[in-house]
């Protein structure tokens, strides 16, 4: 085993460890800020850790007729997000840098949502089925935006390799293209939907559907789904910073300064998500789809501009 492989393994362990440890922390801070905005005391910041430990400590109840997808969907959902975390820089170079292309990243981040869909479908509850239908409509409208954003970056980098796209974004001194500016606006406006926060959490909608696809889940499997959702917020935030606002978070003269700047920007983005979620009402599914349709039109314009070098 050569040194490159050893460092890749160490980097993967560090990235996964950072996501697993920091995701509940960010969730706890998110809850606390939301409570303060709404003039409530709110739970302690450590509450997400306690909730996960409580769920993981419960008995995993299954019947003999439990479908295989219902048994393994939670594990696959969390695994897909953690694998994506190894492709995305977390303040330092991604441990699997160069091991995958943008198509793999799109696949991994979409797979988490697909696992939730299949898990809800296997449960068969009425509320689950309504949540699934909403989630499916949202994914059909939303995933093209993410794909176009990645492809626009790939066009400017002249490569579909993820490291080329992100490295080109971090170290490029060229002017910010019009297509990049448009996609920055599109992704920023739709970011709440990517991380399934208000006003676009129509598929779960606790007050309407009692968490929709996850209604029939409890114990360790529910903990894994919750963990995947928390981790997704962190991975998407890190990817957004690496692609669209990388300035200052690359290699620095002082070790660790770039890492601190990177996580400061991630924290600002999570704070923005929190403020929007705490101050907006949930959209109806038809309102959300119309909103995404408008963003898709702008994204297609950005794709055309990128094709012509703008």
Show which residues each predicted segment covers:
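Alpha-helical transmembrane segments of multi-pass membrane proteins predominantly involved
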Residues: 1-310
